[in-house]
Amino acid sequence: MQGYLSAWLVKHGLIHRSLGFDYQGIETFQIKSEDWHSIAVILYVYGYNYLRSQCAYDVAPGGLLASVYHLTRIKYGVDQPEEVCIKVFATRRDPRIPSVFCVWKSVDFQERESYDMLGISYDNHPRLKRILMPDSWIGWPLRKDYIAPNFYEIQDAH
């Protein structure tokens, strides 16, 4: 089943894969990593001016990593704004996805958290560095194949 936005993307020659609708009726797409930045700009111009959230997850041990974006099209006088969910997948060997910081500034800390926990590198992000874990931390704690260390030496904050 194809939704309104999917039909609009096809009409304008924008390559994507529809993943259907979630339980709330929000359409979900898969976008190729190399196409993500240009499609993000187009969606912003089309009216998806609010990035509600960004998160990431490990699909399976040794498998792909996913970056998920929830976008909302806010218009005055509309009770039910249009929403869409975008999934961008990256390989575990080279997990690189274009940052959309220049499109939605609110993605700043969210992409940094995804980098910190899963190791997804967001190309052209202005401040991509660890945000939760210490800089000296080795590995990506939310990957399914991550082996937690037996201990970690906590340093004084002084």
Swiss-Prot record:
Transmembrane segments: none annotated. It is an enzyme of class 7 (translocase). It is a peripheral membrane protein. It is found in: Plastid, Chloroplast thylakoid membrane. Keywords: Chloroplast, Membrane, NAD, NADP, Plastid, Plastoquinone, Quinone, Thylakoid, Translocase, Transport. NDH shuttles electrons from NAD(P)H:plastoquinone, via FMN and iron-sulfur (Fe-S) centers, to quinones in the photosynthetic chain and possibly in a chloroplast respiratory chain. The immediate electron acceptor for the enzyme in this species is believed to be plastoquinone. Couples the redox reaction to proton translocation, and thus conserves the redox energy in a proton gradient. NDH is composed of at least 16 different subunits, 5 of which are encoded in the nucleus. This is NAD(P)H-quinone oxidoreductase subunit J, chloroplastic.
